[in-house]
Amino acid sequence: MNPSAPSYPMASLYVGDLHPDVTEAMLYEKFSPAGPILSIRVCRDMMTRRSLGYAYVNFQQPADAERALDTMNFDVIKGRPVRIMWSQRDPSLRKSGVGNIFIKNLDKSIDNKALYDTFSAFGNILSCKVVCDENGSKGYGFVHFETHEAAERAIEKMNGMLLNDRKVFVGRFKSRKEREAEMGARAKEFTNVYIKNFGEDMDDEKLKEIFCKYGPALSIRVMTDDSGKSKGFGFVSFERHEDAQRAVDEMNGKEMNGKQVYVGRAQKKGERQTELKRKFEQMKQDRMTRYQGVNLYVKNLDDGLDDERLRKEFSPFGTITSAKVMMEGGRSKGFGFVCFSSPEEATKAVTEMNGRIVATKPLYVALAQRKEERQAHLTSQYMQRMASVRAVPNPVLNPYQPAPPSGYFMAAIPQAQNRAAYYPTSQLAQLRPSPRWATQGVRPQHFQNMPNAAVRPSAPRPQTFNPVRPASQVPRMMTSQRMGSQAMGPRPAAAGAATGPAQVRGVPQYKYAPGVRNPQQHMPTQPQVPMQQPAVHVQGQEPLTASMLAAAPPQEQKQMLGERLFPLIQNMHPSLAGKITGMLLEIDNSELLHMLESPESLRSKVDEAVAVLQAHQAKEAAQKSVPSPAVPAV
């Protein structure tokens, strides 16, 4: 197949340069007049869910897609002209450079549409873009023709021509690798020399006297300000490379007017910035290699902890080279770093200190990672979790049911069997059983609206509450209970369990022993008082420890914690117990264990959750008074 004449049987369009707030509904309203649409998807960041600025629109008929491309290209959506082109899924064809030309020295007034109109006379254009930043056009752009011949015609006719009274350069597109190779070759044959740090009393004549002995120069210039005062640097352009090289070799580092001057090859600003960036990255990489496996990241620090206290807590595990609590405005930011002299000491500190309560909070301790490594790790975890989601045939029984897909699908798309992604609220109400930690004869009010409670990756993140999610989304905790009950069958209640509000139907309860994660802290066991204890008691059962929780399957960990949190929270706020339980389950497991041991900590978090719920309800009440915009019917 000839790559210069591709076919587009899928009738799929790429829509770029989108405003961050553009949604699938807006694009449907814009493109639906061109013909029936199969699907629309705005591409978003996997972690933040923010728009990446482009989308794909799939039509039923190629003729409709072609009509949209011809009539809607560069139309304005939310104040920005959008750029439409055929979707090319083969990256090798997009990046080959065949038919792609580069234009520079463009006038600021030339935009995508003006560039398209100028070059469309030479052939069919696949893509056309003027590169811009926050200040507007950067003065260059690219035009990708369908054929190589059209690109050659455009270069032949337009190179050196005037566009808006500016002479433009038009040439074949070159990759960064090709450009860097050319720049490296030119750098070896340089003739322009840069001199700096020679003081303010230097002028052109004095500089000429110093450098003319190395060979004939085309120009010599000392840079001055508006008042004619020297800026302390200048340039000498020689006729021959050999003369310039000799001047650099002999003059660099010499004293001139009592100052040591720098003499070297003159570089463009972009080239100099690239070199400095490369040196900085190399230094950073060397530093990370030196501290690999010995530098620890510690978060959830108490506000009263300083550098000395942090060093004291970690000193039993080895020799500490540095310990630092990160501060802002004289106040702790809640995290810090501890660097040991060997990886073995650091590993021991992670094993012993992770989850240990220091002051009033359980610490999170892990090996320090670069931002890029941490993002890659989180992305990998997210993709693995999503892969496990897709492996379950019926999504309504999936304990990790994600939010509805970001794509905007029309009814014309045939759905796969057992993949119904959306259920009416009335059907969901019939599918939801009672939670396994509900009291006998009592169902918590609004429990079906409990926020998301899926197991989260154990990466650093702030402990905040998510807003209440709509009832149309299947709560993950509910579905995880349903999965567990179907897989294992009903669990018999423990014999001798105390009756009353704290009794859990069909689920054995465990006793939490205070201080089990910190054996060095000897705390007397409190006598059992129903509903006032941080632990739930059942005779003949072992206390639940952090190791027992870690040994449980991931889908059961939050369930085990929720079964013990719910009766405690129900005693404080009976009508909101379901919602508050779901909100608290967003917190790390180590913190949840601490709350079960500490009634004061649990009450503090519950009060905070109640405040969040009240604020959310007030916001919803305010939004109901404002009419919502109409959404196109599907």
Swiss-Prot record:
Subunit structure, as described in the record: Interacts with ybx1; interaction recruits pabpc1a on C5-methylcytosine (m5C)-containing mRNAs, preventing their degradation.
Record field: transmembrane: none
Organism: Danio rerio
NCBIfam families per the UniProt record, alphabetical: PABP-1234
Keyword NADP: no
Listed GO MF terms: mRNA 3'-UTR binding; poly(A) binding; poly(U) RNA binding
Keywords from the UniProt entry: Cytoplasm, mRNA processing, Protein biosynthesis, Repeat, RNA-binding, Translation regulation
GO cellular component terms listed in the entry, alphabetical order: cytoplasmic stress granule; cytosol; nucleus; ribonucleoprotein complex
Name of the protein in its database record: Polyadenylate-binding protein 1A
Record's function text: Binds the poly(A) tail of mRNA. Prevents mRNA deadenylation and confers poly(A) stability. Binds to N6-methyladenosine (m6A)-containing mRNAs. Stimulates the translation of mRNAs to which it is bound, acting, at least in part, with dazl. Involved in the maternal-to-zygotic transition in early embryo via interaction with ybx1: interaction recruits pabpc1a on C5-methylcytosine (m5C)-containing maternal mRNAs, preventing their degradation.
Domain notes: RRM4, together with the C- and N-terminal regions, is sufficient for RNA-binding. RRM 1 has no RNA-binding activity itself, but improves discrimination between poly(A) and poly(U) in combination with the other repeats.
Family: Belongs to the polyadenylate-binding protein type-1 family.
One Gene Ontology biological process: mRNA processing
Predominant subcellular localization, coarse grouping: cytoplasm
Subcellular location: Cytoplasm
Residue ranges of domain PABC in the record: 541-618
Classification via Pfam families: MLLE (PF00658), RRM_1 (PF00076)
Annotated signal sequence range: none
Domain RRM, residue spans: 11-89, 99-175, 191-268, 294-370
